[in-house]
Amino acid sequence: MWVRTTITVKRWTEERSGRKIERTERTDITRLPSWKRGYPASVDSSSDLFSFSEGENKETDRRCWKHQHCPGHTIHPFSDCGHHNRCMHAVSQCDCESRCRSHRPVSVAIIYHPTHHMYMTDDDLEENWVSRKNHLSPSARPPDPNTGSATEVPDLSVPITIWRSESPIEKCQESNVIKDIKRKEKEQDEEEMVDEKANLKKKAKGKLTKKKTPVKSESSPADLSQSVRGPVRTPESSPESPGGLESEYSCERGKERPSSEDVVESLSPRKKEKTSSGQAKKNGTKKETQKTSKRKKSSPVPNPNLS
């Protein structure tokens, strides 16, 4: 609720000097609701905030400080706000505000007070007025048939606010800050996950490349089996064909040599032709020597008797 006070310098000085006006206006409390709780509007203010002067105006005495309070005009204490002994009245559904609009107030206090009214009995009023340190528990506001207008919807022209213990703007700002922090944390987590995945992929690629690197060419198992079978065949071959044995050994030696693709590709076609022609010549000469040896053995021996 917006709380408003209008005090003139003349009124404030009179209350500070003599309490005559205070006694006359204490009778106005009878026009308050039947429970008779709250502070009167004529209580003087101990604060020096209202001691400044903005010019004297004689018509200010006809404002709400002089009119008789209507049943809907309630007066509330605001001791919890730290504004002690300050005469304030809550603007509600009464015509006092319309009477004051034509006059400029000396000061206007707009105060955010706690979320509950602090009502006191008339007996405790004087004691608590002196000592503000006593804890005051909020009491429920009893209904009154005379103040039916107080519970109705107030006039739009009257300044009224909702009582809040915390500012909604600060809550919105805090929620926005929390959302920003959470969003940044999520982004950082996502970036870390992406980095971890990239590192794992790099490691897997490195392992694959290591496996694909060529190893030095060794004799294949087929070549080894052939080399083992080679000496086993040697006794089967006849002693009469040494050329055949030499050709078999030469073939086996050629097979036992490491055969790599790079060596085969490096050989030129001319070298291949020369090697093939050389091998053919060797085979031909060996065959001719074998034929001549057979002819010598098969030649008939001359019979001496026939001669």
Swiss-Prot record:
Keywords: Phosphoprotein. CDD domains: PLA2_group_III_like. Residues 250-260 have a biased composition (Basic and acidic residues). One of its GO terms (biological process) is phospholipid metabolic process. Residues 134-155, 183-307 are annotated as: Disordered. GO terms for cellular component: mitochondrion. The keyword Chaperone does not apply. This is Protein PROCA1. It comes from Mus musculus (Mouse). The gene is Proca1.
